[in-house]
Amino acid sequence: MRVVLDLVLDCDVERAWALLHSPAAMRFAMAPVLAPTPVDGAWPSTWPAATAVALDTRMLGVPSGRMTVELHDEVRGDVRIVHDRGGPQSGPLDALSSWRHRMAVSPLPDGRCRFRDRLDVSGAAAPAMWPTLWALWQWRGHRLQVLARREG
């Protein structure tokens, strides 16, 4: 099953790229629905490249398991892609048999950028979890648009 966002962000591609690599931006985009906390207690200033960061999560204040964030970057022409090879490690989302998350930004002629966010999940639990994931992705997209409008 797939959740997709295709949005215009009111910032240039450099700012959007920085936001995709910022733990603070992720926390803002997910709040107050999902509250992650680093297992080791310390937030990095940026996500380390190709290194898994373990996070304990709370959804709407209720413990909801552990996930990892592990970013790998790719550039295809003027499109910059982040592959998050992390995913659920425990909790309800761990019932999914696969989790593939990609985000991409590309410049628009007017100086803003296009943001695409795609999550593919599978498994017996996917149909039941899809509505919640879809709603969370819509919220993330809205909050990222708010953050992109702010001065960097």
Task: Tell what function each PLM region has.
Residues 5-7, 66-74, 86, 99-107:
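Hydrophobic/aromatic beta-strand elements that line small-molecule binding cavities or substrate pockets
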Residues 81-135:
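Beta-strand/loop substructures that line and gate deep hydrophobic ligand-binding cavities in soluble
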